[in-house]
Amino acid sequence: MCRPLVTLLAILLGLAAHAGAQDLTLQEIILRAKPAVAVVVAEVGGQVTLRCGGVEKTVSPVPYRESGSGFFLSPRGWLVTNGHVVVVAQEPPRRWMTAHLVEKAFRAECLPGLLTRRGLAPGERPEVEDGLVREAVAATPADRVTLEPTVSVILQNGARLAARIAKYSAPARGEGMSGRDLALLRVEASDMPTLALGDSGAVKIGDKISVIGFPTVVMTHELLSATAKAQASVTHGSVSSFKQDRANQPVIQTDAAAEAGTSGGPALNADGAVVGVMTFVTQGDGGAVQGFNFVIPSAAVRDFLSGTTVALDETSRFNAAWHAGLADFFSGSYSRAARPLAEANRLLPEVPDVLRITAEAMARAKTQPLLPWGQVGGALVLAGFAGYGVLLWRRRQRNLFRISPSEVARLLEGTEPPAILDVRETTAYERSPVRIPRSLRVTLGDLDDGGKRPAVDQKRLVVAYCT
């Protein structure tokens, strides 16, 4: 293959790869986004000192827990979620929480012994158990209970990181969620996956939207493994309306399915940018009523972040590696995908989607031909057309074209006969009995050397005979 054709093939293949990289599928958009979404857990634990059968005990009951979703906006560990997801840790309802923890402690440490002394089995007399619990709660003063609120973030590789609440906007009191129900969390981490904030002002009714989060119904499903529960779920829908909450603040209505636990998760547009944060769902007698869920616009998130040190334009090294690996994978360059995918796994180990795509790329690379023949074939066809076009262009530039012997004979009989040059090789000329009448004998070597030039009017048509 000649060098110009090789160069042309390289250019065509490069252009094809570049065009493919700009056209992301929904699958690739979702895979890019998922690692940046995490579980947010708010807990209130503590220590309860109470009397069990005349003996004083200090008990650490099972903490009260609320969970939701959140997503990283900065590789330095800044994460956004809903305010109501972390409200129990930010503003613990002390009276209710104290009674809750006392009950938990009493049922775990004191109740079994009291029932045994009364000759009762657990669950045999529920009304007796409830009465004993009420007595214990009433007899335990609040100063015997120490509350310990905490917030943590669980990544999709199962890692649990302690978090602090850096900024908080409470939901509207007594009137459900407000639409400015936001919290900014910080974990001690670097190279986190991130999502970019989009322009909620550009969102239109009918636009496609994808919501990523951790619905409780999936997190608590008895048929799923612990690894499966740690992976985010994705639902799809459209923007159905623009409304205002009770505080007259704008919210976006969507028919994308959402459940408890999805709160705080990102709502993505068709480009994978965050245009909102899932905030509340419509509840009916049987649970959430799907098709009527609401999203805080990303413009409100930007306003909420003002005055903080969150850098929204900071590059995530994980994103760079993960996105490059996905681009190679979806373009069919499975072997080339290995390096960026390995880098993504090094920066954030054991993310299920990274492991799955890596394994699939390795399997496909083993059965992939050395060259992408589909692309090569297409490029060769394009190169053929391009080469033919170049040839025609060069001939037109040089006024060169082929004519048949019969056409030459016709021209010789015309009023302006052409000049005939016999440019056959010397050996061929000497061996051949063919001689062309009124032709001029000259070799190509003579023409190239610039020595022997035929005396021909440049305005005349020149026919060269070389076969």
Protein language model regions, located:
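N-terminal activation segment of mature serine protease catalytic domains
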Residues: 21-82, 180-183, 194
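Flexible, gly/ser-rich surface segments that form the specificity/activation loops bordering the active-site cleft
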Residues: 25, 65, 152-178, 195-250, ...
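Catalytic nucleophile loop of clan PA
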Residues: 71-72, 202-205, 257-278
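Catalytic-histidine neighborhood of serine endopeptidases
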Residues: 74-170
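C-terminal subregion of chymotrypsin/trypsin-like serine protease catalytic domains
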Residues: 83, 87, 94, 248, ...
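Short, aromatic-rich amphipathic segments at membrane interfaces
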Residues: 352-374
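Catalytic cysteine-centered active loop of the rhodanese-like fold, especially the PTP/DSP P-loop
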Residues: 451-467
